[in-house]
Amino acid sequence: MIQEKHLTFTINLLVSLFFLTILIIPKGYNYAPIILSAIGLIYFIPLKKKLSFSSEDKKLIFSFLFYFFTFLLSIIINKDGIREIDNPSRLLLFIPLLLLFKNFPIKRKTILYAIPSSALITGCVALFQKFALGYEKPFPETMHIQMGNIAISLATFSIVITLHFFIKKQYKSTLFGFVAIILAIMTSALSGARGGWIGLPVVVGIILFLYKEFINKKLIITLIAIITIGLTALITSPKFGIEKRYNAAKSDIVSYLEKNNRNTSLGARFDMWENALIAIKEAPIFGHGSDGYDEFRHKQVKSKQMAKTTLNFGSLHNQYLESWVKRGLVGFIALILIILTPIFYFIKNLNTHNLETKCICILGIIHIVSHIFYFTSQSFLAHNSGNIFYFSAMLCFIV
């Protein structure tokens, strides 16, 4: 029989590896969660360990199951293929993962050091791939928008943890955290993705607000100044191409608003979103399903109500519209549930004098808030990388 101390060590090691390998190894986001889920299944089912559920656990499990159920419902009502549940079926693996973490809590230090270490290593590898190996974008195995968003998450997580280190007067760790923040932001900049940056000022503002009782105005001004100077340096550096992408986005928006040009990157997305509202009106409750939506957009393109360029997109690039168009109001409610249920949990547990617990809860809040923004410009959960990152990281922060 495996001793519990060995199991605890293994769980913490795998959690560390989840963050450390999430981008630097192709499909690295898969391996640790799958192994952890398998451990959870083995521990609770064959070994017949007693299961105990708190009311918060039950709410979280219900939100997971309901979200998965909407995909099953779409298969039945909209006659989607069975392939549609391949991605969301991973949610079922997160239930034993939740129970495993509840019975074998992750050590706070595992989270506090694994995340900035991941940000630092990921940044170094990204810079090496871009400037030494000549890659167009780092980590080409991962879709660049997904990669850019995950890198921004590593950066914002590192901001939270760095402030924690500063409050605890662990100044060497604080310096380590600052380096991690810079490298994670650089990774996102190199990805070429723009959507993840939209919510960054709001997320940083929330972090500072939640830590306001521990940090003075002088520190807040210093932090904002450092972040502003750093971002300005990144934006103005042609090597990172941020200014070029900003100007391209600005041009796309102006072209769409003034000339109704739907053939640019952003113009096609705006066109998809406009037509998504029409699709929602046609099937508001249960949606069109994936196949039904494909038929809808081909019909719209044929009638010239939708640009042909939109057919090049595999998703709506908006998680909220994607859920409602394909799975109706039922699917949209399920999406809102998997956002609100965990964030209320983290907010409820935020009021504590334990600085480590507070830090982990803030990480949880920031994780959810960041994804609220990611979902506006990307169908983040439609990709395995986004699906696994969102739920796995969320469960790692459950205290």
UniProtKB/Swiss-Prot annotation:
Pfam families: Wzy_C
Residues spanning the membrane: 6-26, 27-47, 60-80, 111-131, 147-167, 173-193, 195-215, 220-240, 328-348, 362-382
GO cellular component, one term: plasma membrane
Protein's name according to its UniProt entry: Uncharacterized protein HI_0874
Domain of life: Bacteria
Key words, A-Z: Cell membrane, Membrane, Transmembrane, Transmembrane helix
InterPro entries linked to this entry: O-antigen_ligase-rel_domated, WaaL-like
Organism: Haemophilus influenzae (strain ATCC 51907 / DSM 11121 / KW20 / Rd)
Subcellular location: Cell membrane
Key word Transmembrane present: yes
The keyword Ribosomal protein appears for this protein: no
Membrane topology type: Multi-pass membrane protein
